[in-house]
Each structure stands twice: as structure tokens, then as C-alpha cells.
Amino acid sequence: MHTHLPPLDPLPDGNNPPQNVPERSDVFAAGRSFPSNIVSFDLLDNHINIFYQLASSSGLLFDGAAAGAADPDSVPDYWGCAAPGGACDEGFHITLRSDNRFDIRGVSQVYPDCSGNKSNSILSQEAAARTYDIPANGIIFLKNTLWIDGQINNSRATILAFAEPIVGGEADINLNNDLLYTDYEGADAIGLIAQRDVNAGQYSADIIRVDAAIIAKTGRIGRNYYGSACANYIRSTITIYGSLATSQRYGFAYTDGTGYQIRNLIYDNHLTFSPPPHYPSTGEYTFISWDEK
């Protein structure tokens, strides 16, 4: 944990763990403790298998490449995207709704790369959406890249993007528009788990808010580098309310001033006792004493 709120934390001193680190209780109310135990992202493999089973049995599993043939658990069975250029060749776009449902469209084309990096932005998609109820167990599993936005109200869902092979594939989750709760007292919860990266794309909103607990299993949470020759190379503000777990270094901005100028990261305390459905954790909180005055 490091802070740039004045006075800035000292630079790393070469020791592991660092020595003579100031307490900074004004920023870290519970203090700072070094070192922390390493948690391997490989431990998620078993969780992903469980999510797949839950989606297949009583949740929703979308497999555009299989289209209900090679993967009989997939819905809808009339979605044929196996051929290049198919209706969901690039992935799926989900818009969550406030009536405990969601709209889903196949994404057929994305904007071209810029500065040698993927735009992670939709150029064309199906005009008509298909609408589904959020399943009772809250699990939605997509076997392709996902774009997601919208707003929920009294809903809870964990949504995963994992392509074949499940261990070693490269599906991403892209966040280019607001993804919001209505209730901020714990009734609403969204979990997002990406096989690789969780991105804010080149054409992401100038001001964007994402309410979710987010995991990037093998990649990073952030935004690709887009130089000054790219459209939207500078964005204003991104706010994430929830939690971040990223295998590689997080970042929505770069040292040359590109990317999001303001990054607000706010931990959702309700995740402690009311996480999204079946969301992975490394343990549970316990009360060791209680004192009423």
C-alpha cells in the first residue's frame, strides 16, 4: 500500500518488506502491515470450474462459438457464431436493467487498433437485443469477450468472461459506459471476473463510474495506452466503487498524461459480509470482541 496524498510516501528503499514506512492513519485507518501473504491467482481455477457448473445447471451459459451444438448447455441454441464474421464473432454486449433482467447482443466488429493496442470498443453489434432474467443463482458465464454496462436495482449477479480453453484462454471484460447500483446499502452487488484483462476502452465515456467487485485473472485492470494521434487519448474521470483484484499492475493513466486524469477507487464495505453470488474470497471476517457503550 502506497499513497501520494501529502506528504508523499518515501520511495522503495530496496528492502523486502520496506522499512521505516510511516503509519499514515489518516489514509489507512487500520494502519499498514508488511509483508502480506501472497495469494496465487491460480487458486481461482477451481472457482471457475464451479462457476461453469453453476451456470450450466441453474444459471446462464452463453457460448457463441458452440451455438448450442458442441455445447448443449449454451443458450440460446439458435445463436450461430462459429464462422468468422458471425453475429457475435467479437463477443457479447450485456446491458443490465433495473427490473432484474438484462439485454444481450452479439458484437460483430470493433474499432481498429491505435498505438498498436486494441481499442476494446464496439463498432457494430446486433440491432435487436435478446432479453433474459438474471438467474436465481446470479451466475452468468460467457465464453467470449464481454462488454457490460447498465444499472441494477435490488439485483445480485456474478458475471464471467472465459473463452476456451478455460485455463489459458484470452477473454476480456470491457467497461466503456456506466455500470451502476441503485441501492448502496448492500442489496445490489455485481461481480466481474475476466479470464485476462478488464479494460476501459479507447472509446470509453469521458466520465465513467463502475460499481462492481472486479477480478482480472491473468491480466490487468486498466486502459491500454493510446497516444496523442488516437481519438479519446485523454479522458476525464473514472470512479470504481467496489474492489479490484488484478494479476498484473493496475493502471488507467500513463506518465505522459494520457488516459484518465482522475481515478477514484472506493472500496464497497458491503462486500465484506454481502459479496456477489459465490464470489471468491480468501477467508471470512470474525468478531473477536464486542463492546457496547
Protein language model annotation of sequence segments:
Residues 1-173, 180-204, 208, 215-293:
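C-terminal globular interaction/adhesion domains in large, modular proteins
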